[in-house]
Each structure stands twice: as structure tokens, then as C-alpha cells.
Amino acid sequence: MATAVRAHVWVGGKVQGVYFRAATREAAQRQGVAGWVRNLPDGRVEAVFEGPPAAVQRLIDWCRQGPPAAVVEQLRVAYELPEGLTHFEVLRS
């Protein structure tokens, strides 16, 4: 079994008001990835993904496009030590 990884992700562009957080939660649940997602005051979306490396990478790749109404212009990823998250949630902005 692969060791879990943790990716801290920031997505910029037209990513708020386009169902990005809810769609990210759905994509994470399909991949079996834990973590969270939230809107930032500066217009970006911030997320943390924890899970098997391949599943986390698929979710990062999904974020490069996001849901149909999104226009992703920037994606920043920082890898961190996993914290053992067990579910995925949308945090209040």
C-alpha cells in the first residue's frame, strides 16, 4: 500500500462563484482523497488533499481545469507532511 501524501493547493483565475468548491469535494470523494477546500478573500481557492500519491495527483490534475464554468489561470502546489485527515469538507470562507 502506498504511503499517503499531502498537497496544499492554491488555484487562481475565475474560480469563485463557479461551483469550484463543491465540484472539488465531489472529485476528492471519487478519488478517495481526504482534506478540505475553501474560498480565499483574494479570489483564489485553497485546498488540502491527503491520500495515495496517484489519487492526489489525479485531483491536482483535475484542479488545472476545474468545473466547466471555471477558468484556471494559476495553480500552486506545496507538498507537506500528511496529518492523517479522514474525510473531505468544504470550509466556510
UniProtKB/Swiss-Prot annotation:
Keyword Hydrolase: yes
Catalytic class of the enzyme: hydrolase
Recorded GO MF terms: acylphosphatase activity
E.C. numbers: 3.6.1.7
Keyword Hydrolase on entry: yes
Domain Acylphosphatase-like: 6-92
Pfam families: Acylphosphatase
InterPro entries for the chain: Acylphosphatase, Acylphosphatase-like_dom, Acylphosphatase-like_dom_sf, Acylphosphatase_CS
Catalysed transformations (reactions): an acyl phosphate + H2O = a carboxylate + phosphate + H(+)
Alphabetized UniProt keyword annotations: Hydrolase
Transmembrane segments: none
SUPFAM superfamilies xref list: Acylphosphatase/BLUF domain-like
Entry annotation: catalytic residues: R21, N39
Family (UniProt): Belongs to the acylphosphatase family.
Protein name, UniProt field: Acylphosphatase
Designated gene of the protein: acyP
